[in-house]
Amino acid sequence: MRFPRAFGFLSILAAALFFGEAEAQPAMDTAAKTVTLQMPATPEPARVTLDPKSTALVVLDYVEDICARQPNCKNKMVPAMTPFMERVRKAGLTVAYGTRAQNQTMWLKEVAPAAADIRVNNTAQDRFYNTDLDKELKAKGIKTLIIVGWKISGSVTYTAVGAMVRDYTVVIPVDTTAAATDYETTIGFYNVLNSGNANLGNEPLKPKAVTLSRTDLITFQ
């Protein structure tokens, strides 16, 4: 039986594709191998002593609408923040709150604003952007900010950078902020230490830079 010439051509083409695919398979397998990247190490939190008269606590997004959906906020941040807020109030620090306007009535009771506290309605993750936060803090002689809240890979980092470019020294207690995953949280800490006046060694209270601390390592004097 004689086959059409076109059939013979298609057979040759199919064979070429088959063997070509077989030869290419090792290269594809190699390319598909998972590459493991080493996570950046988070430095040990630093012990710091702060002057209550020139230090302010800035609270970001500790609100029901967010924390109800975020286990790390409910289970890690709030338990650390509750006793710390009591100490902040007792020491007489200036306290400022920043969230979107629709969330201002949703602050968690553990960190709820007092009548005299500063409040800003933000439209961006950086709470200094398009608000009077800087003006109100400087009017009170504030030089150092403790920034807490949701989340380290978002508003906390953006606000910390906004603070540094406005000449504030920033302290971030690692137990009062987080993100949805451990990976995102670790990257957030790495990024904030690399931002602005970088402080990769986590030098305590490096001027106009971020220091990572922890609530039990912060004293007021």
What is each model feature region?
Residues 18-24:
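Sec/Tat signal peptide C-region and signal peptidase I cleavage site
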Residues 53, 70-88, 93-97:
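A short alpha/beta connector and helix-capping loop motif
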Residues 1-9:
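Bacterial N-terminal signal peptides that target proteins for export
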Residues 25-56, 83, 102-221:
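Active-site-adjacent betaalpha module
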Residues 66-73, 146:
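Surface-exposed cleft-lining segments at the edges of enzyme active sites
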Residues 8-18:
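Bacterial N-terminal signal peptides
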Residues 57-69:
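Acidic/histidine-rich, surface-exposed loop or edge segments in extracytoplasmic proteins
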